[in-house]
């Protein structure tokens, strides 16, 4: 079976001290890049998509193409629902073959967040589907998710312990100073807070908003318990910048088989870098 839960791969990463990258994809080309590159580097892989991605590309298309690529490259992978907010939406996608889910109730008060997440866990675990949830709230923009910096909240370590105990989640997304999108200035991550969370929570931790972070920060976060690193915006920028440059140099170009190649190559370099920083090359 090539479409798998992310639970075992994150537990393996936790025990071995590396992280698994979760790359957000949007279409055939971006899916090809992340699978082909992970296969070349023999890296575990989580392919992530927001609700907007699944609406754009088609749920069945993503599952079918990812499954075909996984078989072609002999690379078991997780297709992950990133920042999903609806239990009904999650239920339908799990029934279609998804086995890795993030339920995002971080915009709710603590008790409501717990109740929503618990309902998702109760459903997903019946189908061997792993569940990630977020406590605290990241600022920034990702697809339709927009959180003003003034509304961002850091994860409370004591609440994190309660949250994990009451929900039964498999991984916890923490807010320690990262944000969705690229950074206007170098962020200051609260590693002391992360260490406190790690001391109180024994499940894998997840770092959202890794695009543009210094490599040293990512490595330090991994040393403090982060087992999954999410990258989205940095991939889109590399891909689109290469496309723009190609058309500047070739204004009459019209063959996607040609102009997609430099875009895919630019994105591949980012994927290779992230896999290297996560320390997961050769970990299959």
Swiss-Prot record:
GO terms for cellular component: cytosol. Zn(2+) binds at residues 83, 180, 208. Dihydroxyacetone phosphate binds at residues 181, 209-211, 230-233. Binds 1 zinc ion per subunit. GO terms for molecular function: tagatose-bisphosphate aldolase activity; zinc ion binding. Pathway: Carbohydrate metabolism; D-tagatose 6-phosphate degradation; D-glyceraldehyde 3-phosphate and glycerone phosphate from D-tagatose 6-phosphate: step 2/2. SUPFAM superfamilies: Aldolase (SSF51569). It catalyses: D-tagatofuranose 1,6-bisphosphate = D-glyceraldehyde 3-phosphate + dihydroxyacetone phosphate. PANTHER family: D-TAGATOSE-1,6-BISPHOSPHATE ALDOLASE (PTHR30304), D-TAGATOSE-1,6-BISPHOSPHATE ALDOLASE SUBUNIT GATY-RELATED (PTHR30304:SF0). Catalytic subunit of the tagatose-1,6-bisphosphate aldolase GatYZ, which catalyzes the reversible aldol condensation of dihydroxyacetone phosphate (DHAP or glycerone-phosphate) with glyceraldehyde 3-phosphate (G3P) to produce tagatose 1,6-bisphosphate (TBP). Requires GatZ subunit for full activity and stability. Is involved in the catabolism of galactitol. Forms a complex with GatZ. Belongs to the class II fructose-bisphosphate aldolase family. TagBP aldolase GatY subfamily. This is D-tagatose-1,6-bisphosphate aldolase subunit GatY. It comes from Salmonella paratyphi B (strain ATCC BAA-1250 / SPB7). The gene is gatY.
């Amino acid at each position: 079976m090539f479409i798998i839960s992310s639970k075992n791969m994150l537990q393996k990463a936790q025990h071995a001290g590396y992280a698994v990258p979760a790359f957000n994809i949007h279409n055939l080309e971006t899916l090809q890049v992340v699978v082909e590159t992970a296969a070349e580097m023999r890296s575990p892989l989580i392919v992530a998509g927001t609700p907007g991605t699944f609406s754009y590309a088609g749920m069945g298309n993503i599952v079918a193409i990812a499954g075909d690529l996984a078989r072609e490259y002999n690379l078991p992978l997780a297709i992950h629902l990133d920042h999903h907010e609806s239990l009904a939406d999650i239920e339908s996608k799990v029934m279609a073959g998804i086995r890795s889910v993030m339920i995002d109730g971080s915009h709710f008060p603590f008790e409501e967040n717990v109740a929503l997440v618990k309902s998702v866990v109760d459903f997903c675990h019946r189908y061997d589907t792993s569940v990630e949830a977020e406590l605290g709230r990241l600022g920034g923009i990702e697809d339709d998710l927009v959180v003003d910096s003034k509304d961002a909240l850091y994860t409370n370590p004591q609440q994190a312990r309660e949250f994990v105990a009451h929900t039964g989640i498999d991984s916890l997304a923490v807010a320690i100073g990262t944000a969705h999108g690229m950074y206007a200035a170098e962020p200051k991550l609260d590693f002391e807070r992360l260490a406190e969370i790690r001391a109180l929570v024994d499940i894998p931790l997840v770092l959202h908003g890794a695009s543009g972070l210094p490599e040293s920060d990512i490595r330090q976060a991994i040393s403090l318990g982060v087992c999954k690193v999410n990258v989205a915006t940095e991939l889109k920028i590399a891909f689109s910048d290469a496309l723009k440059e190609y058309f500047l140099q070739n204004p009459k170009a019209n063959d996607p088989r040609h102009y997609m190649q430099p875009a895919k190559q630019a994105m591949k370099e980012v994927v290779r870098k992230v896999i290297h920083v996560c320390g997961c090359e050769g970990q299959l």
